Amino acid sequence: MDSQGPIILEKSIKIEEVIKIANTSIIDIVTKTVTPEIKAPYELVDVEYDKMGSDYILSILVDKEDGITVEDTSDLTNIISPLLDTIDPDPFPNQYMLEVSSPGLERPLKTADSLKAAVGSYINVSLYQAIDKVKVFQGDLLAFDGETLTIDYLDKTRHKIVNIPYQAVAKVRMAVKL
């Protein structure tokens, strides 16, 4: 503060943006810490850090080929929890609850490899910007070559094919076909 009062910044940042940036770095730190310790047959699917009500939840989603059991999540929690306590400096601004679980039926597809493995599956794709006035596509993933997703989706009553550039994709997850 100078003698004329507080300095007002010309560009304001929304608190949601600050929280998102902080959560991203927490997710990156946790991912780098736990990835080397989650060994076959397990696969780290995703790390999420969110506020639910007044609580913060650190969710570590893990899977294996024949599915995760309650015993698996207990064993993994016993491996992961002490690892998180060793991170220095502590990246968590608040107390949090650790949740180790299966990604479920609508698991996120975060990597090119997971997308390649999902060819033939029914998926949900959210885009950064709309293609033909559509920002979310849900349909069968026909192909993925590392650069383009090809999806067969239903537009009202007609099947259509769309090619989506991989860099245009904000989120992809498995979807349940009803």
Curated annotation (Swiss-Prot):
It comes from the Bacteria. One of its GO terms (cellular component) is cytosol. SUPFAM superfamilies: YhbC-like, C-terminal domain, YhbC-like, N-terminal domain. GO terms for biological process: ribosomal small subunit assembly; translation. It is found in: Cytoplasm. PANTHER family: RIBOSOME MATURATION FACTOR RIMP. Belongs to the RimP family. NCBIfam families: PRK00092.1-2. Required for maturation of 30S ribosomal subunits. This is Ribosome maturation factor RimP.
